[in-house]
Amino acid sequence: MPRLVALVKGRVQGVGYRAFAQKKALELGLSGYAENLPDGRVEVVAEGPKEALELFLHHLKQGPRLARVEAVEVQWGEEAGLKGFHVY
């Protein structure tokens, strides 16, 4: 299965973005994590079926109500066997 790495830029810290990503990932059966970065972005890594990852990416680009997503840098790769979906 593929691996999605998304670096999300905008007003994405302090607005519930990581919890939003976790909720959507779990709804879609994805594994991975969401983590705040020191530069103000959020890194989201997810693994699972390609179709679920593409839908997840759509949600990441929208974000929760209080967020303002300006850009999402995306990289695709091979899965690393992550379990669960964690927020750091």
Swiss-Prot record:
Domain Acylphosphatase-like positions: 3-88
Keyword terms: Hydrolase
GO MF annotation, one: acylphosphatase activity
Pfam family, one: Acylphosphatase
Residue numbers annotated as active site: 18, 36
Annotated coiled-coil segments of the chain: none
Family according to the record: Belongs to the acylphosphatase family.
Protein name: Acylphosphatase
PROSITE patterns with a match to the protein in the record: ACYLPHOSPHATASE_3
Entry's EC annotation: 3.6.1.7
Species, as recorded: Thermus thermophilus (strain ATCC 27634 / DSM 579 / HB8)
Catalytic reactions of this protein: an acyl phosphate + H2O = a carboxylate + phosphate + H(+)
